[in-house]
Regions:
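Residue(s) in the substrate-gating loop at a strand-loop-helix junction
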Residues: 137
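The beta1-alpha1 cofactor-binding region of Rossmann-like NAD(H)/NADP(H)-dependent oxidoreductases
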Residues: 35-36, 55-67, 99
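Conserved glycine-rich Rossmann-like NAD(P)H-binding loop of the short-chain dehydrogenase/reductase
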Residues: 24-40
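Active-site helix of classical SDR
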Residues: 117, 153
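Substrate-binding pocket helix/loop in short-chain dehydrogenase/reductase
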Residues: 93-94, 98-103
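Canonical Rossmann dinucleotide-binding motif of NAD(H)/NADP(H)-dependent dehydrogenases/reductases
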Residues: 1-29
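SDR active-site lid
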Residues: 170-235
Length: 277
């Protein structure tokens, strides 16, 4: 039986990932700060055919993550797959978002994933291999307006994953980074906003996402099984990525022009409602 550790697995995308693996017969360490959510996920994992246990962990605290790693590798156990998933969002213009919100995002989104990699890599090297999936976002590729902290931290995770992919190849440790567009998940539950437009935009984007959390999870696990580096699950994400790489000036120029004319927010909402964001 293969063993996985998934952070942020008490709900949303982390839970979806756990269920995809459970149907393949995996044993999963379900990590989160939400005890009730973890217990719900555990019951669903068992019903889906997998095994598991819960582990309360605040990924923004290095000692919590290190304790989880020590426990995971204890008494000769393997960790075949680590999924760094826990994340949060703060919306607003860069200069308007309180610095404490920036720190909140950086502590969880960046440091939480770095702590995970830093704590689990030695054990994976010792056992002779493994795989790490880091959950980033298309926001890390495209840097959508009014999502500064989220963009910055997810871009950092993409860069971290690219670096680790090279460094860990010699040790038979694979690295995959998944970069989904908006889809219906529980990120909204703890999202921080500065004004009503951001609230409306976020709800519209998540509501009209073309894929479900489970569909994104299935695409992510298939990419891991093929040892791919990048996963961009939605077609629109792939389209935007190609457009940005071909002509960054056009990609950002359209948005900048719309903002200057005063209808940038209307354009953003329209794109979410037709499933283009």
């Amino acid at each position: 039986m293969s063993n996985a550790v998934i952070t942020g697995a008490g709900s949303g995308f982390g839970r979806a990932l756990a269920l995809v693996l459970a149907r393949q017969g995996w044993k999963i360490l379900i990590a989160d700060i939400n005890r009730a959510g973890m217990e719900e996920t555990l019951a669903m994992v068992r019903k889906a055919g997998g095994e598991g246990e819960v582990f309360e962990c605040d990924v923004s605290k290095k000692e919590d993550v290190q304790h989880m790693a020590d426990y995971s590798f204890s008494t000769g156990k393997r960790v075949d797959l680590l999924i760094n998933n826990a994340g949060v969002v703060s919306c607003g213009f860069v200069g308007d978002i309180p610095l404490e919100d920036w720190k909140w995002c950086v502590d969880i989104n960046f440091w939480g994933m770095l702590y995970g990699c830093h704590s689990f890599i030695p054990g994976m090297k010792k056992q002779g291999g493994g795989h790490i999936i880091n959950v980033a976002s298309s926001a890390g590729l495209f840097s959508f307006m009014e999502m500064g902290p989220y963009n910055v931290t997810k871009a950092a995770i993409i860069s971290l994953s690219e670096t680790l992919r090279q460094e860990l190849a010699l040790h038979k440790i694979g690295v995959t980074v998944t970069c989904p567009m908006f889809f219906n998940t529980h990120l909204l539950d703890n999202m921080r906003f500065q004004d009503e437009f951001q609230n409306e935009f976020a709800h519209s984007a998540f509501k009209h996402g073309r894929l479900t959390a489970e569909e994104v999870a299935e695409k992510t696990i298939r990419a891991y099984e093929k040892n791919k580096l990048y996963v961009i699950p939605q077609f629109t994400g792939k389209y935007y990525w190609i457009l940005k790489r071909l002509s960054p000036s056009i990609f950002y120029g359209v948005i900048s022009y719309a903002m200057k004319k005063g209808y940038g927010e209307k354009l953003a909402l329209f794109l979410t409602r037709i499933g283009m964001m």
